[in-house]
Every structure is written in C-alpha cells, then in structure tokens.
Amino acid sequence: MNTVASLFAILPYPQIDPIALSIGPVAIRWYGLAYVTGILIGWWLARRMIANLSLWPGNTTPITEKHLDDFLVWAAIGIVLGGRIGYILFYDLQPVLDNPLVALEIWRGGMSFHGGLTGATLAMIVFARRNGLPVWMLFDLVACVAPIGLFFGRIANFINGELWGRVSDVAWAMQFPTGGPFTRHPSQLYEAALEGLVLFVLLQVLARQFHALKTSGVISGVFICGYALARIFVEFFREPDEQLGYLVGGWLTMGMLLSLPMLALGLWAIWRARRAGRSQEPSGLKG
C-alpha cells in the first residue's frame, strides 16, 4: 500500500501549455477547443440518437437532422453567453464593474455551468417554439449528450490549472501552479468523472436499455439531479472561489447553493414525467 502511495506521490501536475496551437498572432486555447469538441461530439451523437426511432415515443420523433443542424448555433450561443453571464453574476462581478471589457475575455476562463444551463435552456425553449417541436423532447435529447461537454470542460479546467481542490495529503494529490505550496485534490478530474463519464453512461443506459426517452422529461430530470448531486459532492473537495470563499459555516459554497434548486427542479421533472406517463406533452410546453 505504501509503495502504491509513493508511486502516486511522485506524479507531478502535468505542465500543459493552455495554448494548444498558435497560428501567427492567433492563439487557440484548450479551453476553447474543449467547448467546440464537446458541442460537436454531442451534435454527432444526437444525430445518431434521433435516427434510432425505437428510442422515442411511438417509434418516431419530430426532431430531424435539419433541426439539430440549425440548433447547433443556438446551443453554442446559449452556452457561451449564459455561461459567461452566469459566472460574472454569481462569482466575479466586481472586475466587470471596474472594467466592462473584462466580460469579453472568455479565453481566460470564467464560465459557469449553471449560467450555461440557463442559457442553453432558454435557447431550447425559443428554438422549439419557433419550429413547433415538443420542448421536453428537445430537453431530453440535449441532456443525453450534455455530459460530453461537461467532461471536456473539466479536463480543460485541469489543463488550465484552475478550479483546483482543497488542501489534501491523499496519494493522488497534486501541487497546482497557482495553488500555492500545498498539494490539493484534483477536483476537476473528480467532476470530469462524475458529471461527465458516469452521468453520460447512466443516461445512455436509461435511454437505450430502459427506454426512458419514451417518457418525455425523465432523462432531463435525471440529468439535472445527477449533475446537482455530483456537484454538491465534489464541492466538499473543491476549493471555493477566492473572491467568495465559504458562504456559511465554513462548508457551504456558491456551487452547492446553485445546485440545490437544480436538485429540486430535477426531482420535479421526473415526477411530472412519471405522472404524465406516455401521454403527449402538456399544451403549455409544446413548441
């Protein structure tokens, strides 16, 4: 056991340049590539899922590949705008008040999942209504592939050496470049595993083996609950943002506070879906 711990202990934090590629004066960062990669892989998988009609209610879906192609731009705008605005409002408003141009520096990081989810949700609602699509069906489709983007986003956080964990002496703790002289939990990797890999596998199993997409809203609810539970759990290992610290009692963080309403919303979505059974979407939620 001590030998295994020693092997982990000598593994340093991998110093990876945040800039993946430079073309003249243009620097392409891993952070931006993570968003693009997550969106494109999610789009590709979503196309395959709508082509598999056996997954959907009545073995048919009104969502076409053309709809997905058109929605790709809406999704990107909703995620980026919502993520950036959410981060500014929830985590770091003062620098933007001092210099509004800071809000445009997306390449430096500073994106909020909760804001990105809000932006993406608004984009889905508007897109569904404009195209006459059942909004819960679109929610479910996007939820099935969203963990892919979460996985790549957390890996990018790790490469950037940001959002590291609390001080720890566990065998796999790392000393991050901006984390001081202490070894810390690689909490970005915990989130990549739970919010990304585990949640993705869970949703795919529910959709493909248990036909959860046939009851609109179940997948959306499980995704929201799954993310909220994973985030609350990892927050116990993640260092809170320096400018905020702990909100209450040395344990409650902003990430926890924002995830608690998500958990309630996810449970409501599952309850609503189970109550509706296999009936059609409520008229108030149709596009």
Swiss-Prot record:
PROSITE patterns for the chain: LGT
Residues the record lists as binding a 1,2-diacyl-sn-glycero-3-phospho-(1'-sn-glycerol): R154
Gene Ontology cellular component list: plasma membrane
Stretches that traverse the bilayer: 26-46, 71-91, 106-126, 132-152, 187-207, 217-237, 251-271
Entry coiled-coil feature ranges: none
Pfam families given in the database record: LGT (PF01790)
Superkingdom of origin organism: Bacteria
EC number: 2.5.1.145
GO biological process: lipoprotein biosynthetic process
Compartments where found: Cell inner membrane
Keyword Cell inner membrane: yes
Keywords, comma-separated and alphabetical: Cell inner membrane, Cell membrane, Membrane, Transferase, Transmembrane, Transmembrane helix
Topology in the lipid bilayer: Multi-pass membrane protein
InterPro entries linked to this entry: Lgt
Single Gene Ontology MF annotation: phosphatidylglycerol-prolipoprotein diacylglyceryl transferase activity
Pathway: Protein modification; lipoprotein biosynthesis (diacylglyceryl transfer)
UniProt record similarity statement: Belongs to the Lgt family.
Function of the protein: Catalyzes the transfer of the diacylglyceryl group from phosphatidylglycerol to the sulfhydryl group of the N-terminal cysteine of a prolipoprotein, the first step in the formation of mature lipoproteins.
Protein's name according to its UniProt entry: Phosphatidylglycerol--prolipoprotein diacylglyceryl transferase
Organism: Allorhizobium ampelinum (strain ATCC BAA-846 / DSM 112012 / S4) (Agrobacterium vitis (strain S4))
Protein's gene: lgt
